[in-house]
From Swiss-Prot:
Pfam families: Hexapep_GlmU (PF24894), NTP_transferase (PF00483)
Organism expressing this protein natively: Bacillus cereus (strain Q1)
Organism lineage string: Bacteria, Bacillati, Bacillota, Bacilli, Bacillales
Recorded metabolic or biological pathway in which this protein acts: Glycan biosynthesis; glycogen biosynthesis
List of residues binding alpha-D-glucose 1-phosphate: Y101, G166, E181, K182, S192
Name of the protein in its database record: Glucose-1-phosphate adenylyltransferase
Length: 376
């Protein structure tokens, strides 16, 4: 029997991320590079480490190899523990054959044995594909104080975007009275962040109930949470007011990277009290040539800059040759940009080679973002 834990985190990291197009052709969405030196999953894992959550199960499925290699034993996030720590949980074969995760609830249900060994009081369920910084221990305190069966972290979203999210309708005490999955005509703009705290006994009971229902799609938002409400369980909304971004599309991924370049951003990567940890690529120092110009940009290790870079994010090992301009763009690891190239409002994928004289910018709508990438 493993050492008993008060709270165990389960991090859902198996999503395909098809809206990110070629960036996720051969890569799980949580492993997509972000912010010049990170992967998307770094934010959730760092939140766990900073919140004192020491036992994390990571549920993977789609294109898991690079993600598994990246996570390793969790030492980058100080989660390489003798008891607990990080455990990668892909689907596995039983006597009846391999059982794939069919939904978010299915993924947790198939790993109830993993949870049971820790005898937790609470289970924190997380998504590995959002950008935010959050102290989960404060949410757990709120959950306990409110004597909730389930607590769901929510954030106010613009009304014209509310129909894209699971929306919570609450009373004055922030108790959830109705849950609507992507409503056409929302009555609230409190969106679910995909962060749940369950009392362990409730989670186990309702996942087993959901698994027995042949009509269920095995999803928390569509099936489990509405059932809990129907049966009178106490669901509380936990309001979150910091930065949070769903980077599920090429444009939203670009926007989140651009947010890092603002003079005042609520997503401060320089906060020494809440560090975002990552695997160190061990590249040499960046080199900025004499005639190069760099403004308002994040430039990681191993970059060689001989041209101009303005308001952009460059990952490790990027080369920008003489005469080239990179403006309002994200250039992912190892990309090579030749001479006299113009790149504007674009994401350039890992290891891409941009030939001399190429011009890359939105052709029709100036608000668009261009993606130049190939699945490896």
């Amino acid at each position: 029997m493993a050492q008993k834990q008060k709270c165990v985190a389960m991090l859902l990291a198996g999503g395909k991320g098809s809206r990110l197009s070629a960036l996720t052709k051969n890569l799980a969405k949580p492993a997509v590079p972000f912010g010049g030196k990170y992967r998307i999953i770094d934010f959730t894992l760092s939140n766990c480490a900073n919140s004192g959550i020491e036992t994390v199960g990571i549920l993977t499925q789609y294109q898991p190899l690079e993600l598994h290699n990246y996570i390793g034993i969790g030492n980058a996030w100080d989660l390489d523990r003798v008891s607990g720590g990080v455990t990668v949980l892909p689907p596995y074969a039983e006597s009846s054959g391999v059982k794939w995760y069919t939904g978010t609830a299915s993924a947790i249900y198939q790993n109830l044995n993993y949870l049971s060994q820790y005898e937790p009081e609470y289970v924190l369920i997380l998504s590995g594909d959002h950008i935010y910084k959050m102290d989960y221990s404060k949410m757990l305190d709120y959950h306990i104080e409110k004597e909730a069966d389930v607590s769901i972290s929510v954030i106010e979203v613009p009304w014209d975007e509310a129909s894209r999210f699971g929306i919570m309708n609450t009373n004055e005490e922030m108790e959830i009275v109705e849950f609507e999955e992507k409503p056409q005509f929302p009555r609230s703009n409190l969106a679910s962040m995909g962060i749940y705290i369950f009392n362990w006994a409730i989670l186990k009971e309702y996942l087993e109930m959901d698994a027995r229902n042949p009509e269920s799609s095995n999803d928390f938002g569509k099936d489990v949470l509405p059932l809990l409400l129907d049966e009178g369980k106490k669901l509380m909304a936990y309001p979150f007011e910091g930065y949070w971004k769903d980077v599920g599309t090429v444009k939203s991924l670009w926007e989140a990277n651009m947010d890092l370049l603002r003079d005042e951003t609520s997503l401060n990567l320089n906060d020494r009290d809440w560090r975002i940890y990552s695997v160190n690529p061990n590249e040499p120092p960046q080199y900025i040539a004499e005639k190069a110009r760099v403004e308002e940009s994040l430039i990681n290790e191993g970059c060689v800059i001989e041209g101009d870079v303005k308001h952009s994010v460059l990952f490790q090992g990027v080369t920008v040759e003489e005469g080239s301009m990179v403006i309002d763009s994200v250039v992912m690891p190892g990309a090579k940009i030749g001479k006299n190239v113009v790149i504007e409002r674009a994401i350039v994928g890992s290891e891409m080679v941009i030939e001399d004289g190429t011009i890359i910018r939105p052709e029709k709508n100036v608000d668009d973002v261009v993606l130049i990438a190939e699945g490896k």
